[in-house]
């Protein structure tokens, strides 16, 4: 039977519990990528891969609206502002944009805008179309025409104060020109580097022996976020203005007018911004910009469309993290051909064996690429989660033609020595997309994925997925905290901000203490003493000094460290104090810090609600392990068209003594399509009966279902918990940690939204807003909008022509208000 991983399962086939699991996992993954991209300027996936994650999350939220806004990624825009800079709270949030890739999506976007506004196709509707600059978002605040503050996007609400650095950028005026400059004028735009300036900066970096920047975006971000403005001044950063934040008055009523006003004020604006009045015109401009892309001299990754009229923008408003009135139309990924020189395996924090292709360096989209992700074992073999071929080798690519004697069936895998097509979508980690079979060496052999961890020699296994009845795509090391690669990564995760948040323990200290043998598991952090800690740090410093001397061709001198005892001792005391400050920790943070596969922040909070403390959680998992389901029970629900509900009906019928489960009426609501699927899987009626009886004997017990049936936890997470706590060394590590720290249950935060937790129903004709606007406003203020009235309804907003819902409200004693009263409440909120 085909496997269905949570990532592969079509959204339309998901149950509510499966959707919640997938939503939680995706949200946590996206939030981590946001942190790396916006907070560290160090992304690890391509823009296209990130966009795919976002689109799947949005698809889940569209089908399951109750999940919208429940995860960090649903509402987050960037990443928290760095502690290196002063914080600036944006008067108007700096939001992100939704993405589109196909031309039909642009048509759908325009139609969606018209539906929301109630505009017929005959009524004019204008948009602006402008290049999407691949740089760093910036907000400039002018007061009285003078630049007073410049801030990065940060997380959209709070950014970093980079005013001193921005004052060194020649293209950004310190004073705005003109008589119509608003008293308060917040300008939003993008800082970027031209291709020529980027090449010059990297040439200077190479000459000075410093690391090269991967691409202009990273170079621009790194240059702007310098603590020393002198470094920023030495880098020729540029700027395009394209939007407004807080304005005391508006110099224009349209986006196109605003761009004209910015130009009058002396701000640089993109000359390729155009006002369009039809989808055809928008797409024509997109194609024109794509054609000109290579000649622009700076990086762009698409075109941004915005509703031109500000009054309409205000009516359209926002949804989660993006405006309804704007959309980014992304360009396809860029590509090139090169050769795989080696395949290496990196071990991740949770023990995942991650294959990486070492490539003969090649320029892709202006960036020199020497590495590419190979994702997992199946991807190297050229198959998907269902065992279907994902590559077949290509017969034509940039002049390469397939010879007649090359067998396409042998072209699905990736081998060392292969000539491959590499795709890159505006980021640093590209991927191997296909193989040019004509250039495959005669001695190239299929890659043998290791079954032992390259870091510690422990077994590496592909875990059994209880939801699909299949093996996971990722092979993992079972060494846990005894694995050097995994151990350090787990410790880094343990001290990270959203886990134990131990200040000062960065990667360097973790590596130093791990290599010195002082810290091999989390509990060791709480056993550190001053003298051994100091000795390890001093030894590490001396070793690095000796390495630098040897690299410079000098003989290392055996000399004592310079006497900076007071500073050094103070720093070490600060580290120890930071550890001591974490001897009491909320239970959810403790759980998250353990780095258990599938247990992100949201799941950790759910587990902390289920169990009062760690011993109770561990006992609950042990009990779940003792009564977990067998493979026949799992397999029955993983068949095509047969889910958990049908499985329960089949089991109930078998338990009731039904001998022919496919007879009419034997199983409630069993469709003909489901009967066909069952017969295809089990051969005949007797085979089905035997399989269901086996599944009946393998039903999970209550302890397992207590976790697996909970929509916030689910079967996959339950399996991960069982796997983690089944390893004796993991249990020992947790128990050792519990001897050092105390957990406490976190309180429930107060709701911030005005109508938080309330259910609102709209009925009748609404005269001053469309139904979509009303729903969006209610949800923005924290309410849940329902289509029917019940005793659980808190408020009914009734317009003219209200019918049965108004009667239901009277029946249940629900408060009823008019549209005018609702708008007054919204205005006061």
Swiss-Prot record:
Catalytic activity: NAD(+) + (deoxyribonucleotide)n-3'-hydroxyl + 5'-phospho-(deoxyribonucleotide)m = (deoxyribonucleotide)n+m + AMP + beta-nicotinamide D-nucleotide
Residues annotated as signal peptide: none
Enzyme class: ligase
Annotated SUPFAM superfamilies: BRCT domain, DNA ligase/mRNA capping enzyme, catalytic domain, Nucleic acid-binding proteins, RuvA domain 2-like
Active site, per annotation: 132 (n6-amp-lysine intermediate)
This protein's UniProt keywords: DNA damage, DNA repair, DNA replication, Ligase, Magnesium, Manganese, Metal-binding, NAD, Zinc
Classification via InterPro entries: BRCT_dom, BRCT_dom_sf, DisA/LigA_HHH, DNA_ligase, DNA_ligase_AS, DNA_ligase_CS, DNAligase_adenylation, DNAligase_N
Domain of life: Bacteria
Any single Gene Ontology cellular-component annotation: cytosol
GO biological process: DNA repair; DNA replication
Family matches, as Pfam families: BRCT, DNA_ligase_aden, DNA_ligase_OB, DNA_ligase_ZBD, HHH_2
Enzyme Commission number(s): 6.5.1.2
Chain residue ranges for the region called Disordered: 1-23
Domain BRCT stretches: 750-829
Cofactor: Mg(2+); Mn(2+)
Binding, Zn(2+): 453, 456, 477, 483
Positions that bind NAD(+): 47-51, 96-97, 130, 153, 190, 306, 330
UniProt GO molecular function: DNA binding; DNA ligase (NAD+) activity; metal ion binding
Family statement drawn from the similarity comment of this UniProt entry: Belongs to the NAD-dependent DNA ligase family. LigA subfamily.
NCBIfam families found in the cross-reference section: dnlj (TIGR00575), PRK07956.1 (NF005932)
Described purpose of this protein according to its UniProt entry: DNA ligase that catalyzes the formation of phosphodiester linkages between 5'-phosphoryl and 3'-hydroxyl groups in double-stranded DNA using NAD as a coenzyme and as the energy source for the reaction. It is essential for DNA replication and repair of damaged DNA.
Protein name: DNA ligase
Organism field: Methylobacterium nodulans (strain LMG 21967 / CNCM I-2342 / ORS 2060)
